[in-house]
């Protein structure tokens, strides 16, 4: 049986935590930042955890993580 392929886009976006969940960077912080408030940008700086319902989908895209 051939090896399973890792979804490269997902591999660049998600990291697995010790508890088995996936974390990623928040979106909306790359460009067009002048109209966004300092508070909004500050809250977007942190990492976010993927929703529990999406964990199985991400796990399927990242079989060796």
Curated annotation (Swiss-Prot):
Q: Which GO terms describe its biological process?
A: translation
A GO cellular component annotation here is: cytosolic large ribosomal subunit
* Basic residues biased stretches: 10-30
What GO molecular function annotations does the UniProt record carry, in alphabetical order?
A: structural constituent of ribosome
Supply the alphabetized keyword list.
Answer: Ribonucleoprotein, Ribosomal protein
Which InterPro entries does the record associate with it? Ribosomal_bL35, Ribosomal_bL35-like, Ribosomal_bL35_CS, Ribosomal_bL35_sf
Region called Disordered, residue ranges: 1-30
Family membership, please give it. Answer: Belongs to the bacterial ribosomal protein bL35 family.
Q: What is this protein called?
A: Large ribosomal subunit protein bL35
The gene name reads rpmI
């Amino acid at each position: 049986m051939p090896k399973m392929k890792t979804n490269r886009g997902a591999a660049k976006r998600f990291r697995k935590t010790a508890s088995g969940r996936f974390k990623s960077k928040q979106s909306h912080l790359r460009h067009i930042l002048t109209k966004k408030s300092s508070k909004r940008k500050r809250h977007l700086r942190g990492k976010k955890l993927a929703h529990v319902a999406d964990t199985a989908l991400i796990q399927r895209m990242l079989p060796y993580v």
